[in-house]
Amino acid sequence: MSFVTTIRDYAETLNSISDSLGQNFTVRSFILETIVYIFTTCRSCLFYILSFQWIHDFTLLPIVLPEFSSALFREKFFLETPSKVFFDFLEISDLQQNKFLLGFFNSFFLSLPFSVIHILSLRRLLIQGRPAGVYTIGGYLIGQLVFLTCVVFGIRQVLVPWLTLEPFNYLLGIILLFRVIYSMTRENLIELKGWSNPRYTNFFLVSFVLAWCEQTSCFQYLGNITLSSNVTILESFSSTSSISTFFTHTSYLLGIAIGSVLFSLFWGWVFLQVKNLCIFYTPLFTSSFLQFFNKTSFVLALALSLTSIPFYSFEYLVTGPLGFVSQDSVFKNTLLDQTLIKDPGKGLTGLSSLERNFQYLDVDVSPFDRGEYLTVPEVPQNLSFEELNYRGEFDWTLRNLKVSGITDSRSGFFTLSKLFKKENKKSLDSQKQLSSQEISERNPLLSELPLVFRVDLATHYDILNRYRQFYDGNVEESDSDPLLQRPIETISDSSFPSSGEAPQPRVENTIESKIKNKYYSNPVYKNLLALDIDLFLKRQPKTFQVNADQEIDLYTKRKMLEYYTNSLNSYSQLPYFETFDSFFDGAKTFSNKVYNQQFKGTLRSVRRLFTVRNDFVSSSEKLESKTEKVLKFDQPLYQFAEKQPFSPYHEELAQKPEQVLPRAKIGGISFVNTPLYAGWDEHLRKFVITNKLLPRTFAGYKVKIEPQTLKNFTNYSVKQTTKIKFTRWPLSEEKLQLSKQDSSVPYVTLFKILDEKTKETFAENKYLSFPANFELVEFSESQNEKGTTEKLKKPTLVPNRGGFVWPGNSKFKLPLLSN
């Protein structure tokens, strides 16, 4: 198997080089590349033997052999290795792969003197002497290093029992801290002499245990800062073998250990110099300085210890140890429900008695994964972040809530639901246009589009009717038990509530404009708001910004890819596919649709000020006009730098002219923009859509779209009425027999017969344009059926998926080898 793999790789290498060089692939290049391949193969074999990787592979044979067998039955001639696909593919080089330096610099964040144990260590260093400080910080560093070792190497025998004690280990740390602080208040402010004091053992052990407990800090999220591409310092690194894994993580931990010691010594030296400067250059005596620092350290230690308590939720500290999960439904509509908040202004405002009976405001305080976002306009929504924090929005929201409450009290509809929720304000007139003065006074970063525009979503009643038609239509028509109808009716009413149960208050758009214009025309408020938004947007790296044209280009090609992949899904063969596609508008799962990870919440206020959608272009003419940039938190760049033009995150975009293969070098073959097949390329590790006319080097790196096709597709994507259908390649013989005008499926072939005379001349070469895996298989039928043995030739496509089974390659481009 290894010999066949070597020959296969050699043939693949020559094919790749021949595709890249084209006519420049000479005999000299062939000999040179052959020598390089032989040298690289010998080096890999020598490393494989000396690194004892063959022992590791031999021990995995009982696991690998069943995978080989099952892969043959599934016709998947490669092993699924998710770790290699998901971790190695996007792994970025960390400090030139020097894990020792990476650990050394990451230790700087672990050594910052902001935690309680660092403050106590500095207190013992400056008051009780250097030995006391060394033993205290030494126990903490060793305990921290042991904990990191257990996490990085995955020593579950130690970690799992300890982590199952949460939150008792956190409470143990709090108790130890208060005990240490209490004992320090009763100590004399004298320096301990020598390095063999028996109290040093207590200092070391207490610090070691505190390193394993929760450490409070001024910046709770500072521990996640790392110079690598990993999420935290505790992340491990991928390696090719067990020996490489051991040495890689050992060097990383060694760098953390040495860096922690050096940076801790540095901070100790800095505070000793500060002590000397305060004593020699200030009127403070030594005793006064020690008393001042002693009191300050106690206050800081107590403050940091108490700040960790509200950092954790009540369920983590109390309900979690009792067996309740996060956001347990048992606590719904109780005092422990996190989605309800008391009205802080109850009893302090001039509202009526009926309004004061509203116990809770309609404020979105639900966790990030439990909120209701992107609902239709008629569904009542919670107050967003912008409506509560920006003064211009909050004043209008507060007035609208008062008007809504007074109107509800006059209507006489007093139900139990009003005790918990208020009706939201009525939707504003989406067709209203602002004056040019209001637009000119906004932030330059804001969109110049109308401040209010309608989002192209299905209306409330269309969704309700469609839901009842497809889901509970059969139940309503049947004479089943009402108990069976009640759950479905409950789901329908809760998912699509009607807005006509109570009269809605009348909202005057002119009053809203006056209230908001009072703030947005104020230069102080306008500059502060613009500064807040600009500082937020400037937190992103400038080298990763994209312009508006690139946003539209990305969105258009993503929509085309979405339609193409939806046409290849298995449910397209269902008998009721048209109904399925009409109801779900394509794929059923949200992950198969085009979306931007850009916000948390509804952004009802921000949508009026920024452009947050890419599909706002309603005509092809707007593509040629000036477009606005989309507000989003991730700004992926096409290309990283001039020296590194390729970006693995958006390889589908058109590259620079000098990086695109000229048309003349392809031998006069015209490009066919319609993709013929799509699939995962195991060698390039990416999803490739190509038509077999591009060389392998450029396959998947360029998606060229004609201007007319782009305009037509833009109109289709906006209207959402015309679906672009694709079909798989190859087409059936029945489809090919029909002309392009008579065929219901548009198609483009790799070759075109000019006339009947040409068809007769080239009849024997009709299979030359098929791919390399096309074969003519000879078989013989039995004599019982035909009476004579007759050999026939039928075309077939053999599996060509790469991996461990090699189906062969096409002919080399080198004339010496192709002959």
From Swiss-Prot:
Q: Does the keyword DNA repair apply?
A: no
| Topology of this chain in the membrane | Multi-pass membrane protein
**Cellular component terms, GO, for this chain's entry?**
chloroplast membrane
Transmembrane portions of the chain = 45-65, 100-120, 135-155, 158-178, 252-272, 298-318
List UniProt keywords, sorted A-Z: Chloroplast, Membrane, Plastid, Transmembrane, Transmembrane helix
Q: Where in the cell is it found?
A: Plastid, Chloroplast membrane
Is the keyword Secreted in the record? no
Similarity-based family: Belongs to the ycf78 family.
Protein name from the UniProt record: Uncharacterized membrane protein ycf78
Which species does this protein come from?
Answer: Chlorella vulgaris (Green alga)
